[in-house]
Amino acid sequence: MTEAKSYKDTVNLPQTKFDMRANAVKREPELQKFWAENQIYETLSENNPGDIFILHDGPPYANGSLHMGHALNKTLKDIINKYKLQRGYKARYVPGWDCHGLPIELKVLQSMKQKEREDLTPLKLRHKARDFALSTQKEQSESFQRFGVWGDWEHPYLTLTPDYEAAQIGVFGQMALKGYIYRGLKPVHWSPSSQTALAEAELEYPEGHTSRSVYAVFPITKASDTAKKVLTPYLKDLGVAIWTTTPWTLPGNLAVALNPDLTYAVVESGKPVCKHQYFIVAADLVDKLSATFETPLTVKATLKGEDLEHTTYRHPLFDRESEILIGGDYVTTESGTGLVHTAPGHGQEDYIVGQRYGLPVLSPVDEKGNFTSEAGQFAGLNVLKDANEAIIKELEEKGALLKEEPYQHKYPYDWRTKKPTIFRATEQWFASVEGFRDTALEAIKNVTWIPPQGENRITPMVADRSDWCISRQRSWGVPIPVFYDEETNEPLLNEETINHVQAIFAEKGSDAWWELSVEELLPQPYRNNGRKYRKGMDTMDVWFDSGSSWAAVAKQRPELSYPVDIYLEGSDQHRGWFQSSLLTSVATNGIAPYKMVLTHGFVLDEQGRKMSKSIGNIVDPNMIINGGKDQKKEPAYGADVLRLWVSSVDYSSDVPIGQNILKQLVDVRNKIRNTARFLLGNLHDFDPEKDTVAYEDLPELDRYMLHRITEVFTEVTEAFETFQFFRFFQVVQNFCVVDLSNFYLDIAKDRLYISDPNNLRRRSCQTVLKVALENLAKSIAPVLCHLAEDIWQFLPYKTPYKSVFEAGWVELESEWKRPELTPKWSKFRQIRDEVNKVMELARKDKMIGSSLDAKVLLYVSDKELREHLDSFNPSDSLSNNRVDELRYLFLASQVDLVDSPKTIGKANYKSESETLGVAIVKADGEKCDRCWNYSTHVGEFVDDPTLCERCNAALKGEF
């Protein structure tokens, strides 16, 4: 008996050194090194043929490790930049850092011993703060680069460099010369814990703040002429009732504001609730207040709000009289009494009313939040600690307290110290938004906002905002370049002085303000003009720092342009950087600094909760990349998985992340990787120059596949063009699994492995594989940049491009688009799904092992479909084009089209409906040793008795 021949070496199995595993911790840094050594980003951003494209970086704060918000933000930016580079744009990205401000100052102070703090001069503090900011910036920069983010990392912008600070002084100077900068005593958000003014963007409003609210009565002393008639009968024992959630502001009370259009009532209380028998409240609130005070209030008289104007009352705690005045539309009947206690030194609306009536700005509180001597008996008490208690007690003793109750509401806290803030009037520098508000609102309309509701967020913020307080009482920042006349305290701020300081900062940096004398900082004409000056010690709000970046970076660097194409940050920046940049740019140039603004949400855990140390649900981006201490619990996934997560979520709202989500993403990455590996392995002997099959010679299956490739990558392109990266994620994942792995590649194995290497049947398939592989690599490159490059480096044939990024974007030929093929092939694929289901039943019962053990019986009622199927079912496996056949489509050895559904009914394994019947029976003939198909021709060939007719022909180079 002769030994059976082995045909193992005659089969064309895949060959590639492309690793099945990503091994990201080792491989990603190698690929990043390859990009750096070959200067891929630099070359493309410099030499691409298209327009310059600028996504301007909103600077992260240089004061700690990166969190998931940073990862989301920087990766989104990088996806856009890489896509634009692939599309031929000169995408130039300069990463930036916000380096000044209180948070860094606090970090430095916290790291020092008490003794060190006592010896601290502003200059020493600034040097320590600079060192801290620079070391943090370096760490963050390395992390961002490990994410795979491209940019000009050698020349980032830092808000602490001399060129930046000088440009910022330039913006300030232009605004000052246009009359938009002024000094005023105004109430501002003041943080006693930081001892400085704060901007709106530096506040947060935590849940669950409870204030001690009080209803109090101020005795009326004189009725206005228009109210005399109504009030006179009650004047002897009449008060005006107010409500406040900040009793500590009562020493600053200089008026009571009302709404002129409301009706007010003089009420009498059923039982005594204060020393007055009668008091005035809004008529609409009588019933509500009766319940609050737990006594019936009887209406004795009513009058219009406007008639009460100029009625006077006495302050219950101080020896002074004030008037009832007309307030704004903030005086409502939603809460309180319909009459608002007004302290112009402690509130924005109060201040505006006070200005209208010429009231002084009284703010008897110092920078630590303690009452000054102006608060009389309350001097020395802290307004956030013991002042409320003392004031409420005093109101009670004077018979002026109606009721005290806890009130839960949103209250502003210092975003860094996490402690409550107050409104306090101080001498500050302001940017007058009023001067250019309309231009700013017009500019907003000319910007594209993605998502569109961004416009609806920023518009009311700009429309309703007060003037911008830009001064801070801290050392670590850019100084406001103002001098004061020692004698008159008049500020000196003009073109000459500003330009002189700007030139000094450009050369020496803003430390010069502390290092140089007043004489050196002043231009020549002011040095000996008979006046003595001192320099101001306020620094600028850090939002003015970052808000000047368009001027310091985009406008100043020759390789960039202004206005820039895109700003992209979190949705909280409508009140922050988007707005400060808009205001400075509009004030100086009349235009927005950006053409488009994209916003993303916040990162939450898998349960949709905010990340916090106390819950212990913080996900660290570096941990995702490099893994944790326990690699079983926290494996190292690499940067691509992090980037894939960014593309998988709808970033326009808040987005979740956690271990379960990451595991799913690893699966998706691996599926894409394995698909690419199969494609690479089966192209090992393909030379595109000589082996490519012309389109007109391709089997219909291949032409259908090229049509699907066109559909898929057109949709991917549209996803990137519209910044809907989650669509890219869904489409590519679906393409790899449904179109390639489960369909085309499944069918292709027979052609690729069994046919003669040079046969058209095989080369036509490889022609499609090459198109699929290259377009897959290019399309994932903006997101899975490391995987895409890894694939490209293992291409088995010559390519003129050393990097996938040099190869540009996906390439699709117009002739590949054949929508007319879709209906027929969709039907074929549906039938295939049905066949697979029945195969599975037969396999489960062990009637068949592989699908090649089966013959498929098929009944269709539709005449046209029957004809299509007939044309795909030749009687002879060596005729036709040997590709467009049902047996290959179904991965079966034979297919019979039957004329009657009864034939299907007789089989054990079947699926029947009115229009389609599928049955699985044993295949005819013997199993071929080489291709494992069953054939009635096995045994016919003397030299190869165990082979079928296809393999016999293949070995002769004919199949």
Curated annotation (Swiss-Prot):
Zn(2+) binds at residues 928, 931, 948, 951. GO terms for molecular function: aminoacyl-tRNA deacylase activity; ATP binding; isoleucine-tRNA ligase activity; tRNA binding; zinc ion binding. It catalyses: tRNA(Ile) + L-isoleucine + ATP = L-isoleucyl-tRNA(Ile) + AMP + diphosphate. Its cofactor is Zn(2+). CDD domains: Anticodon_Ia_Ile_BEm, IleRS_core. Keywords: Aminoacyl-tRNA synthetase, ATP-binding, Cytoplasm, Ligase, Metal-binding, Nucleotide-binding, Protein biosynthesis, Zinc. L-isoleucyl-5'-AMP binds at residue 569. Signal peptide: none annotated. A motif ('KMSKS' region) lies at residues 610-614. PROSITE patterns: AA_TRNA_LIGASE_I. Binds 1 zinc ion per subunit. The keyword DNA repair does not apply. Its EC number is 6.1.1.5. NCBIfam families: ileS. This is Isoleucine--tRNA ligase. It comes from Gloeothece citriformis (strain PCC 7424). The lineage of its organism: Bacteria, Bacillati, Cyanobacteriota, Cyanophyceae, Oscillatoriophycideae.
